Amino acid sequence: MILIAGFLRVPIWSSCKLSGSEGRIESILVQVSKLSSIQSNCDVGLIGLAVMGQNLVLNMADHGFRVAVFNRTYARTKSFMERCATEPCGGNVSAFETLDSFIKSLTRPRKVVMLVQAGDATEAIIRAVLPLLDEGDVLIDGGNALWSDTICREKELAGKGIHFIGSGVSGGELGARF
């Protein structure tokens, strides 16, 4: 079953699990229809829903973390939420179409993981998300950035009160998932 409603191009999707009368698990995608209902209740946010990002989100959700997700292309986000509906993620994944709504969904201090290509893509995400972050928030680059770029980013963001961690994620598709 899929329930879809719209509001100001700021859809928010959550995956929920319901037990059916026959012991089956049904997954439903629920879209919240009021912008004012955006609450800061996600433990961590992840930007970048390629294979590694998707599997890391599912891993965190399986372990009880409430995870907000954002991707540059919303079509990939919707596709991931359809996948999530078939996974035992326990309703712990929420997807956002805008960076602003994504950041607002995170509990403080906010923890944001980026799993995007090193270089220009990483830099673009940092520049886009930086005005939305506050002192004490944490930004983690899980890509394979050049070490000298990581040092420069850490220094720049520290000056703004943002904790920056450059820590490339490895282990492949299955390593991220399990």
Language model: regions and residue ranges:
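Rossmann-fold dinucleotide-binding core
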Residues: 122-127, 146-178
